[in-house]
């Protein structure tokens, strides 16, 4: 298959699935060759889907029932608060959330970093994650604990210091096999391919793949692009006005501790620039998980959860598991 990639020929879903499993037993030199050849050619939806399905199949198994995930590819280079973590906690007031996360890639506040800064403990085992889900409707799945098969590949990625298909795979490889997913990407070119790949991995009922003018979140100060999958695909653009919200500045964030403090400020009802950023993305997640009829409804539901104290109470429940 290496020659095929060098000749810039695309792989099928089946070939990509096979290649992932081959890489687990290859030398570091050949792993690097495959990853660079694939990246140079440009990855397709079938290749992303094949790798993601193989990554899930090689993951530590966990059954949490019908869950939603909110995460992004990262790698957008932004210094923002960790919106997806805020959204996942709000969403868990209404439905089961399995947050598949890791430490920071390029931001100042990766989801695992912020989760711990909020005073929450990352579950050590699938049994601990199930306990958290049963008690709180929320479980944090720390990616390295569920993908031990990647131990051989990760050093190669780090040594290469270039983007590879693995920069895309994290959100597609949640071992809990979410039925609903909101997934941010760091380039508009990835929208359709990632949405198609997500549909091919299997099990997804509804998903939003989104890009927010340089962010892997919906942006509160410009236009965002969304590819929605609900048995069929639809691509459209949105602004804060579609959510009934005013435009808001994106304020830089310098650390996980700062991100955690600012999330708690919003959860406490503070009216600031972060609030609309979080409300917009929470509304999209509520809509995706079928807990809101549309984006406007989602904003009102999220607002009520914050203003009634439900979200702060939920955070306290998660802390105390």
Curated annotation (Swiss-Prot):
Major enzyme class: transferase
The protein's Enzyme Commission number: 2.4.2.18
Cellular component GO terms held in the UniProt record: cytosol
GO molecular function: anthranilate phosphoribosyltransferase activity; magnesium ion binding
Residues that coordinate or bind anthranilate 1: 72, 102
Protein's job: Catalyzes the transfer of the phosphoribosyl group of 5-phosphorylribose-1-pyrophosphate (PRPP) to anthranilate to yield N-(5'-phosphoribosyl)-anthranilate (PRA).
Record text on subunit structure and interactions: Homodimer.
Protein name (record): Anthranilate phosphoribosyltransferase
Source lineage: Archaea, Methanobacteriati, Methanobacteriota, Methanomada group, Methanococci
Primary gene name: trpD
């Amino acid at each position: 298959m290496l020659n095929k990639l060098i000749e810039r020929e695309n792989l099928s879903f089946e070939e990509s699935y096979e290649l992932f499993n081959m890489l687990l037993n290859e030398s570091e030199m050949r792993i690097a060759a495959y990853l660079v050849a694939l990246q140079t050619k440009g990855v397709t939806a079938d290749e992303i889907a094949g790798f993601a399905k193989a990554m899930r199949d090689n993951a530590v198994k966990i059954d949490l029932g019908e869950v939603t995930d909110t995460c992004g590819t990262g790698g957008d280079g932004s210094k923002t608060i960790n919106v997806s973590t805020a959204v996942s906690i709000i969403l868990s007031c209404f439905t089961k959330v399995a947050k598949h996360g890791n430490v920071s890639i390029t931001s100042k506040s990766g989801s695992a970093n912020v989760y711990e800064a909020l005073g929450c403990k990352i579950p050590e085992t699938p049994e601990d994650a199930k306990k958290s889900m049963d008690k709180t409707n929320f479980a944090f799945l720390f990616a390295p604990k569920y993908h031990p098969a990647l131990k051989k590949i990760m050093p190669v990625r780090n040594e290469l210091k270039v983007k590879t298909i693995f920069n895309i795979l994290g959100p597609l490889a949640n071992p809990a096999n979410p039925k609903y997913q909101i997934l941010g990407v760091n380039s508009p070119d990835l929208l359709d391919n990632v949405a198609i790949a997500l549909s091919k991995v299997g099990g997804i009922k509804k998903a939003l793949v989104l890009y927010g003018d340089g962010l892997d979140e919906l942006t509160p100060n410009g236009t965002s692009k969304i590819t929605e999958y609900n048995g069929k695909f639809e691509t459209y653009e949105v602004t804060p006005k579609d959510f009934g919200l005013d435009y808001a500045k994106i304020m830089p964030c310098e650390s996980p501790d700062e991100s955690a403090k600012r999330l708690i400020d919003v959860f406490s009802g503070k009216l600031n620039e972060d609030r609309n950023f979080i409300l917009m993305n929470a509304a999209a997640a509520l809509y995706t998980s079928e807990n809101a009829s549309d984006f406007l409804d989602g904003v009102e539901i999220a607002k009520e959860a914050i203003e009634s104290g439900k979200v702060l109470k939920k955070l306290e429940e998660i802390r105390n598991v």
